[in-house]
């Protein structure tokens, strides 16, 4: 039954995306940019409804008060395709730095360009990267939320952190707050899998790390606060969802955390 529900959800998920893009594209490009953003945000909301109704997966967001009204860097853990879109409805005007090749995709690329997403050639250096930074500064000055995944790629729940220093350079150069975000959607929507699992989890938006720190100090603090919250949520999520099949990385990390608790008495 779970395989059937997963198949049904996956089918409707992509059908929902394709139909909305085709049907709503004319309206999307007529509307002003910020108003048009409600179309992808409503797509995200509809996906939450599909996942709740078909699979039985729900979530809650804590710490929305930690999102500033000024420009900021939003720095979530990255475990699943889910976290690439799920928080769009909770952010006023998010912007991504994307591989430039994504902008070449019909419909998707057009949508992204309308929302002033920032394209980057990952092989580029020098002047090209300076242009990316200038674009990022423009969007920060407009009060937008720059979404950056500090580890760069999807990591399974409980995996050893592999943060990339690029976010420290952005923190130094953009001089805006960084908002760490901990969550474990990868337990319910695993990477490289078509299975979807029912249950409930939390997304925890942590207090801002304000600008002005030395980049090395910032980088260590980002890792420390994010991983501490991530460990807490891992234990809580597994305790509240005992039916979940856990990846080896989560099993190992839970054993390590429980061992520390035992040693601490």
Language-model features and meaning:
Residues 61, 74, 96-97, 203-205:
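Generic preference for hydrophobic
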Residues 63-67:
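Glycine-rich helix-loop-beta junction characteristic of Rossmann-like nucleotide cofactor-binding loops
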Residues 21-41, 45, 52-54, 69-125:
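Catalytic core of membrane glycerolipid acyltransferases/transacylases, capturing the structured
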Residues 61, 118-121, 211:
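Short acidic-hydrophobic, aromatic-tinged amphipathic segments that line or gate anion-handling sites
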